[in-house]
Amino acid sequence: DPFLLGEIATVHALSDIYASLCRPLFSLAIINLPETELSIQTNQLTHILAGALIAHSQAGVRVVGGHTSEGGNLSVGFAVTGSSTKLPSIIKVDKDEDLRIILTKPLGTGVIMAANWQLRAEAVSVDDAIANMRHSNLQAADIFMQHNIIAATDVTGFGLARHVQNLAMRVGIEGCIIDLTSLPLLSGVTSLFDAGITSSLHEQNQLAATVHDYDRHPSNLSAVLFDPQTSGGLLGVFAAKDAKNAINALIETGHRA
């Protein structure tokens, strides 16, 4: 669906700015159209831009130009420029401080899209994944900033484990404990992993992350650690005293944190 593709690509691209705790200002579109009849290309481009412009407008961001190319598969991306009113600071965390990591969206878009490609995904799972990918991280970023966020990123193609690992390195801690049963998941994800379905990037993500004891879990739930996400949620580090209020604020605003 070119309209949804344009919308989700926008939300995905803007998320990098929100994860930096900044505000997006404008973007440039990069669109590749398959070689086909001009009327089909025109229709695809029109629907892509319609979805993208609506999502940009909702975020208060302008599309100021872009580039199109032809050949291969239909693809859409945006180069986004943002700004911050705060000067960058060096992150310093006491190694003995009690910290929590908050994830603002459920996981599983990678495995659901892989299953859908194989015609093995339930409609409810696909619908849940699409709704999740369309959901902007703007409000979650605002909540993070209101509750003394220490550091943040967003969960995208590298999967949760690698992004948690990178975040831990940024704040100077040796590692994190992830309770698999506490992770928010999209509909049907556990069943898909139990059926042996994984995304094409799954194995690569597993090799790239340093994770201990994940294979001791009694089910295949640990596979979600390496599932690549499209338009995934924000991941934030908080002091334990601030994390509870941040979680409550996210849940009150409809986030499946």
Report the location of each language-model feature.
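Glycine-rich phosphate/pyrophosphate-binding loop regions near the starts of catalytic domains
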Residues: 1-105, 109-126
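Short pre-catalytic strand/loop immediately N-terminal to key active-site residues, enriched for Gly-Thr
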Residues: 3, 124-132, 150-151, 221-224
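Short, well-ordered alpha-helical scaffold segments within catalytic/effector domains
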Residues: 10-11, 49, 134-138, 219
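Structured alpha-helical segments in the cores of large, soluble enzyme domains
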Residues: 14-20, 132-140
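Glycine-/charge-enriched secondary-structure boundary and capping motifs
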Residues: 37-62, 69-74, 146, 152-257
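Short, contiguous, pocket-lining structural segments
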Residues: 70, 107-108, 128-136, 152-156, ...
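Short, hydrophobic/aliphatic alpha-helical segments
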Residues: 96, 136-149, 219
